[in-house]
């Protein structure tokens, strides 16, 4: 059928043997990353649903930015799609999609690294494959009366 996906040669349906023991010995295993991502997914109700996906603008097509939100749980992901090169971009957030006002600056906690940044509407990111291929941010609403620092933190 014209325009349909061909399953026979589709990479996503192929089984590929992985030498997990060798990857562990060589320090190239992705098992800890997969384990961490599964832990993050279980901890965030926003990641349990399929229909709450919102994309945000990046000025580099090699990076993708999207968020998922359920109630007060907001997760923002920025990922490098280039497995070979470091990529940089300015991310422009659709603040209302995050449940925020356009002018707000909020703490975002990277669930992969443990680091916290303050992000506003526009933010600079630099992601290196093999070291920091993505950010998985938990967007934290500041408590009432907390000072707003403003500005975008580099990551």
Q: Where are the regions that the model predicts?
A:
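Carbohydrate-interacting/catalytic domains
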Residues: 1-155
